[in-house]
Amino acid sequence: MTETRYVTTPIYYVNDKPHVGHAYTSVAADVLARWWRLQGHEVFFLTGTDEHGQKVEKAARDAGMDPQAFTDKVSQHFRDLTGTLGLSNDDFIRTTEARHKAACSALWQELAKRDEIYLGHYEGWYAAVSYTHLTLPTICSV
């Protein structure tokens, strides 16, 4: 048996409906998953949605909806996209699902047990538009 391959798309932000960029990355991941399957590899292909963040909160507020109801609605568009494109994904995960929260909690606990989590110091600004943390040297170099 050959080694297992893991393929994932980005987990897409649900601040708006899918667009051609989402389709592009999804199809690219699907092509890779199918290619590896044709080569005899066991493949696990994951896609899904990231339902946290300031952009998502703002989009829900702008739509006049409860954040969970908003993410339920928009996430369904992404799930539908997998069928529309005929993707061969094995799973679709949402970051608001209990199984995702449980996995994150277990990972955190394991890292804490190994002393891999520590308090540090960070100074900078967060640009919600680009999901980027910026430091003063970065800003000054632009």
Per-segment meaning from a language model:
Residues 116-123:
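Short, flexible, mixed-charge glycine/proline-rich loop motifs
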Residues 2-74, 91-109:
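N-terminal catalytic cores of NTP/NDP-binding nucleotidyl/phosphoryl-transfer enzymes
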Residues 42, 88, 117:
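Residue-level detector of anion-binding/catalytic polar loops
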Residues 132-138:
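Conserved small/polar residues in nucleotide/adenosyl-binding loops
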Residues 78-88:
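A glycine-rich helix N-cap at a beta->alpha junction
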